């Protein structure tokens, strides 16, 4: 059975893991590829401390982003309803449809905070009325907003 060595990845490698991961690889792979090309470094107590500090900083940053998303979710629910004006034909049907871009513009106008339209899920809206759109603010935080379509 071949001996394996433990290395710390300095960049993400699809077959092994992401940056900062500790992985066990064959000695030849580490010696001939990972270490010379700077894709990994030998594990030492100093390297372990460095990786631990980096992971702590990343966790703090991720927690901060999640808290900002939760605060924005609360702000959206406080506002309650966003109004979008569209042109309407004689039979009350919209010219075109309400898109996620329209919803993003309405939210940005009301909150002064930009939201990526690709994170907004809007049902097919072809008539006037009230609808609900879902917004993904963070991988763990979603929000629902009410949309009022008027002429």
Swiss-Prot record:
Record key words, sorted: Ribonucleoprotein, Ribosomal protein, RNA-binding, rRNA-binding
GO BP annotations, alphabetical order: translation
Entry GO MF terms: rRNA binding; structural constituent of ribosome
UniProt cross-references to InterPro entries, sorted A to Z: Ribosomal_bL9 (IPR000244), Ribosomal_bL9/RNase_H1_N (IPR009027), Ribosomal_bL9_bac/chp (IPR020594), Ribosomal_bL9_C (IPR020069), Ribosomal_bL9_C_sf (IPR036791), Ribosomal_bL9_N (IPR020070), Ribosomal_bL9_N_sf (IPR036935)
Keyword Nucleus: no
GO terms under cellular component: ribonucleoprotein complex; ribosome
Membrane-spanning segments: none
A Pfam family hit: Ribosomal_L9_C
Lineage top rank: taxon: Bacteria
Family matches, as HAMAP family: Ribosomal_bL9 (MF_00503)
Family membership: Belongs to the bacterial ribosomal protein bL9 family.
PANTHER family (UniProt xref): 50S RIBOSOMAL PROTEIN L9
Function: Binds to the 23S rRNA.
Name listed for the protein in its UniProt record: Large ribosomal subunit protein bL9
Native organism: Prochlorococcus marinus (strain MIT 9301)
Gene symbol of the encoding locus: rplI
